[in-house]
């Protein structure tokens, strides 16, 4: 950990949480790291943002990919004028595009702030409340499980073994009548 850097189990070189290199949009310069023969440095708080593929895990593939043809369709025999159809298509597409941009401009950062706070609280509760409660419960339940195991082996096992021996001597034979 000399110089404020450390290496993880996969061999990635990380910096300390303070952003000493780069910014949040391009934290590392891979070409420069290759030139100097250094490992690429990964910061736990920053990563390079892909501005082209903004849904790399395909979270919204089946939900928000709505096009004009998915919403409005004219069956055979009931067609409007071609100009109206083209204008409707253009109006729908442009309105959807710019209204989404307007909404994301107005509400994008506040919603990101709200969801960031929500997931920070969720992570905090999971790390500092849920996991310790579960571990505590598992430790405490071991005592009960030992007592329960002794009870089962002392009372239930002999009882069910005796019942099993009683019913094991029952024989059933079937006969077909002609």
From Swiss-Prot:
Topology of this chain in the membrane: Peripheral membrane protein
Main location class: Golgi
Subunit and interaction comment: Homooligomer. Interacts (via the N-terminus) with DPP4; the interaction is direct. Forms a stable heterooligomeric complex with CAV2 that targets to lipid rafts and drives caveolae formation. Interacts with PACSIN2; this interaction induces membrane tubulation. Interacts with BMX, BTK, CTNNB1, CDH1, GLIPR2, JUP and NOSTRIN. Interacts with SNAP25 and STX1A. Interacts with SLC7A9. Interacts with TGFBR1. Interacts with CAVIN3 (via leucine-zipper domain) in a cholesterol-sensitive manner. Interacts with CAVIN1. Interacts with EHD2 in a cholesterol-dependent manner.
Residues with lipid group (S-palmitoyl cysteine): 133, 143, 156
Annotated organism of origin: Rattus norvegicus (Rat)
Post-translational modification: Phosphorylated at Tyr-14 by ABL1 in response to oxidative stress. Ubiquitinated. Undergo monoubiquitination and multi- and/or polyubiquitination. Monoubiquitination of N-terminal lysines promotes integration in a ternary complex with UBXN6 and VCP which promotes oligomeric CAV1 targeting to lysosomes for degradation. Ubiquitinated by ZNRF1; leading to degradation and modulation of the TLR4-mediated immune response.
Cytoplasmic face of the membrane: 2-104, 126-178
Domain of life: Eukaryota
Biological process terms in GO annotation: angiogenesis; angiotensin-activated signaling pathway; animal organ regeneration; apoptotic signaling pathway; basement membrane organization; calcium ion homeostasis; calcium ion transport; canonical Wnt signaling pathway
Interaction with CAVIN3: annotated span: 82-94
Start-end of intramembrane regions: 105-125
Keywords: Acetylation, Cell membrane, Golgi apparatus, Isopeptide bond, Lipoprotein, Membrane, Palmitate, Phosphoprotein, Ubl conjugation
Region (Interacts with SPRY1, SPRY2, and SPRY4): 149-160
Pfam families for the chain: Caveolin
PROSITE patterns: CAVEOLIN (PS01210)
Region Required for homooligomerization: start-end pairs: 2-94
Protein name in UniProt: Caveolin-1
Modified residues (Phosphotyrosine): 6, 14, 25
Sites of N-acetylserine modification: 2
Tissue expression pattern: Cortex and inner medulla of kidney (at protein level). Expressed in the hippocampus.
Region described as Interacts with SPRY1, SPRY2, SPRY3 and SPRY4: 131-142, 167-178
N6-acetyllysine: residues bearing it: 5
Protein task: May act as a scaffolding protein within caveolar membranes. Forms a stable heterooligomeric complex with CAV2 that targets to lipid rafts and drives caveolae formation. Mediates the recruitment of CAVIN proteins (CAVIN1/2/3/4) to the caveolae. Interacts directly with G-protein alpha subunits and can functionally regulate their activity. Involved in the costimulatory signal essential for T-cell receptor (TCR)-mediated T-cell activation. Its binding to DPP4 induces T-cell proliferation and NF-kappa-B activation in a T-cell receptor/CD3-dependent manner.
Positions carrying Phosphoserine: 2, 9
GO molecular function: ATPase binding; enzyme binding; identical protein binding; inward rectifier potassium channel inhibitor activity; kinase binding; molecular adaptor activity; nitric-oxide synthase binding; nitric-oxide synthase inhibitor activity
